[in-house]
Amino acid sequence: MYSFMKDQYEQKQLKFINGTFERIRHFPFRRYPLTSFEDVTVRRDKSVNNDILLIYIYAGTHSHAYGNLKYFIEKCVRQGDHVDYYFILQQVDNKPINESDMPLLTSKTAYYIQHENKCYDFGTIGWFFDHYTIGNPWKNNSLVDKTNRKINLNKYKYFIFMNSSIRGPFFPPYFIELVSKSNINYYWYSIFTNRINNYVKLVGCTISCETVPHVQSYLLVTDLIGLSILLKPGNWGGAYPEGIFTCYPTKDHVSLYSELPSSNRILESGYMIDSLLTKYQHINFSEPHNKFCNSNKNPFINNAFQGTSLEPYEVVFVKYNDFEWTKDSRGRAQLYEKWNNDIKLVNRSSW
């Protein structure tokens, strides 16, 4: 009976992939519809070394931080996804964090590293570069440095910086279905890395025009050229002479001398910045008439993006913390997460 039904329902369907229509065969019955990339079995090319370095800054400074980290690890971190993950745990009062209490890392290329919480994200990333990497084009490494440090920046094609103030990724179920049937190597990060090219060198979820247009730093993606621009010492782009990845004492210092200069430097180098926001596609933010977008408002504040709040399915990651002024997108993300969990709990079948 099952074989008969399979023969009856297995079919060829048209799909639009990479600009062309292809016919694929698939059996449409499944225990429940796909809801996230954790459900997708993706072809892994074991012959390719990891070419993405991801640095995630975790600070348990709000009630959702642990949940954000757990959600990300469970949905995204997979063996063979071409990413080296470094989760930096910011210690409170310099007290070691019990890593057995943290979400389990099942990938052999995912690691926890502990650091005293005396810097914000950019300063902590700078500490990581100074203590664990070689290959910084602006620093001469001694033989001792090369012996003590193990991560060569030059082996990576892309670099992702993010923190525990956000939750995601969120993708519409129909997008997950499309990816699952296309039989291509598409990962959660591909929606960002695919936007990096010869013209675009800094990508994130959102661009804010508060003060000046800039990619918001809760998630930043760049390549080796972009990283070289960001790593360069000096006050270029509005940074302090020490550079962008400096340990600044306050959040305002970080915004003024790290976050804003990151985008400034990319634009001043003749490259573009980009985000997932539909409104800002193919906009050259180096042009003066584009510098006052969205009335210079921060888009992730409730109803601050042309009278609307950010949609998780558009920007993939949203602010998810205790602030009242981010509750709209946080509430929507919470609802999507519940709906996706409900699909599995009720063992709903796909038709």
Where are these regions (language model features)?
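ER/Golgi luminal nucleotide-sugar-dependent glycosyltransferases, focusing on the catalytic module
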Residues: 2-351
